[in-house]
């Protein structure tokens, strides 16, 4: 997906026929169901492709086929929660891709909560408004991650497992951490006032604790943008998907029976 360039179809031209649109939307729905349940590794790709559901072009269908090639190849992947004598306390990694979409320059929020070394809650979504700086995009992402952290704490308490310490949130943005801690506040951040005080409230009430992490170690990076081959493999290994380890590379598209079936369906709908 890193090399696939997707742009909206110019209006009012309609390249896709109704059968293609229906097939595309059905496939996106299936991929989204899988992504929400057990596959954070495809979250960004699914979100990106879903933006073109109303009028997919052949480029979008080709990218969708590539996504399903990967899904078929990694069908045995799954989340593994390994029993530990000293269970790991949940942590969160949060990241943002600033103005990554050239069509509207809206940034993407990505966060992942992990326990026992395995994800259990994640999100990859476009932000509601255009951020005017990297710090603003990262801070908006941290705001949504902190809201989810608060909900996780409340849910855990309701089922009888209250947290005994703040939930740790890791970000690779020093500017964002400075804003959240109150050491970097001036006129340029005034419009972030509501989010600013809500995150500080969570910190002051010991619901969350904010930490810095290097960008190359941020596990939420895969949720915000397409990654190069090596980086993508590293991120998937972080998520503890495969019992036997992550292979060097996926097979050529169309090698398996499942992939051939997906390919033939796409070709039939296109004809």
Describe these PLM feature segments.
Residues 66, 93-102, 220, 224-227:
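Acidic, metal-ion-coordinating active-site neighborhood of RNase H-like domains
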Residues 1-78, 214:
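C-terminal reverse transcriptase regions that engage the nucleic-acid substrate
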Residues 69-94, 163:
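Structured nucleic-acid-interacting core domains from mobile-element enzymes and related host factors
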Residues 3, 32, 76, 90-91, ...:
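Beta-strand-rich binding-surface signature
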Residues 39, 95, 169-172:
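Retroviral integrase
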Residues 31, 92-135:
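RNase H-like nuclease fold core
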Residues 19-44, 97-100, 108, 135-154:
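Conserved pre-motif C helix in the palm subdomain of viral-like polymerases
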């Amino acid at each position: 997906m890193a090399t696939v360039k997707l742009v909206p179809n110019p209006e009012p031209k309609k390249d896709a026929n109704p059968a293609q649109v229906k097939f595309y939307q059905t496939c996106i729905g299936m991929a989204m169901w899988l992504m929400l349940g057990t596959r954070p590794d495809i979250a960004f790709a699914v979100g990106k492709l879903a933006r073109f559901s109303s009028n997919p072009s052949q480029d979008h269908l080709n990218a969708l086929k590539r996504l399903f090639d990967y899904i078929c190849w990694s069908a045995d992947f799954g989340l593994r929660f390994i029993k530990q004598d000293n269970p790991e306390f949940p942590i969160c990694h949060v990241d943002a891709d600033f103005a990554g979409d050239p069509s509207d320059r809206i940034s993407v929020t990505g966060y992942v909560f992990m326990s026992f070394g395995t994800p259990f809650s994640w999100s990859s979504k476009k932000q509601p408004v255009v951020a005017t700086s990297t710090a603003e995009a990262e801070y908006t992402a941290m705001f949504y991650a902190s809201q989810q952290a608060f909900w996780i704490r409340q849910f855990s308490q309701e089922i009888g497992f209250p947290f005994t310490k703040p939930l740790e949130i890791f970000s690779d943005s020093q500017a964002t951490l400075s804003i959240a801690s109150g050491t970097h506040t001036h006129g340029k951040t005034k419009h972030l006032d509501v989010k600013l005080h809500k995150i500080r409230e969570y910190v002051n009430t010991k619901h969350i604790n904010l930490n810095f992490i290097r960008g190359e170690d941020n596990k939420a990076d895969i949720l915000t943008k397409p990654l190069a081959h090596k980086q993508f493999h590293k991120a998937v290994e972080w998520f503890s998907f495969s019992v036997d380890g992550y292979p060097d590379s996926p097979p050529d598209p169309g090698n398996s029976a499942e992939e051939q079936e997906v390919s033939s369906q796409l070709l039939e709908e296109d004809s």
